[in-house]
Regions:
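Flexible, glycine-rich beta-alpha linker
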Residues: 48, 89-107
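Conserved Rossmann-fold NAD(P)-dependent oxidoreductase catalytic core, especially the SDR/UDP-sugar
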Residues: 25-66
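Glycine-rich NAD(P)-binding loop of the Rossmann-fold in SDR/ketoreductase-type enzymes
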Residues: 15-26, 61, 65, 69-72, ...
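NAD(P)H-binding glycine-rich loop region in Rossmannoid oxidoreductase-like domains
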Residues: 1-30, 48, 52
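Mid/C-terminal beta-alpha module of Rossmann-like enzyme folds, strongest
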Residues: 136-192, 216-218, 222-226
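SDR active-site strand-loop-helix element
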Residues: 1, 39-45, 91-93
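Active-site Tyr-X1-5-Lys
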Residues: 62-89
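A conserved pocket-lining segment of Rossmann-fold NAD(P)-dependent short-chain dehydrogenase/reductase
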Residues: 110-128, 132, 139, 150
Length: 227
């Protein structure tokens, strides 16, 4: 149970809490009452409330949107249900991409197919391909694991490289140039520009051993998404 990618307004703020917090908690409570052994809650990187930088074990939880706040409150409620007979696994994935996914990926894909020139920016972002996320959840179930998890692809993603690979998946070529970089740096106060070209990663120390077993590599994940 959850909602995302809906523009937040004063009118729909309560809806985020009803679905992402209340419904998620009631689902977990029902599962425990039915003697389910493990409950996996899909939370979000949004619980940190930051748009730039490196997230590590000391990064404070400070969500600044109804989405992030509702996810964090759900985590806190669901965690209270945990005991020896009810395992709780909380996942905080970064941006998820794949066929049919919403968010920033479709914007980048659209740019990759329309523009012959794109900024060459040396940024890094944690992302995860939807099938890799599914594989990660499968591993949690197979191992009956509990705790807090930060799944991501085996490599950080560079925005310029992603656009290049998307274009190549369609037989197109995009020329990368640093000519636009000064303008991009000035525009990073814009939330959309910052999400595309800023840095936002999970520190590698948060990644669990053997997490990437069975994961699809970045280039193949783009080809599967685009074709």
């Amino acid at each position: 149970a959850g909602i995302a990618h809906i523009k937040e307004t004063k009118e729909n703020k309560d809806f985020y809490y009803k679905v992402n917090r209340d419904l998620a908690y009631e689902t977990a409570r029902k599962a425990k009452g039915e003697a389910v052994r493990q409950f996996i809650f899909l939370s979000s990187m949004s619980v940190y409330g930051i748009e730039n930088g490196v997230i590590d074990k000391n990064t404070p939880l400070n969500p600044n949107t109804a989405y992030g706040k509702s996810k964090l409150e759900a985590e806190e409620l669901i965690k209270k249900l945990e005991d020896e007979s009810f395992i709780i696994a909380i996942i905080r994935p970064p941006m998820v991409y794949g066929k049919g996914c919403r968010g920033n990926y479709p914007r980048l894909a659209g740019l990759a197919l329309k523009t012959p020139i794109f900024p060459k920016v040396d940024n890094k972002r944690s992302m995860i391909y939807i099938d890799n996320l599914a594989e990660f959840v499968k591993q949690l179930i197979d191992n009956q694991s509990g705790g807090l998890f930060f799944p991501q692809n085996a490599e950080y993603v560079n925005t310029s490289e992603m656009v290049k690979v998307i274009a190549e998946a369609h037989g197109k070529k995009v020329v990368m140039t640093k000519l636009f970089n000064p303008l991009i740096n000035l525009m990073k106060r814009n939330n959309t520009v910052n999400k595309l070209f800023g840095d936002l990663v999970y520190e590698e120390g948060l990644i669990n051993n053997n997490q990437h077993n069975g994961f699809i590599n970045f280039e193949e994940s783009i080809n599967l998404t685009e074709n």
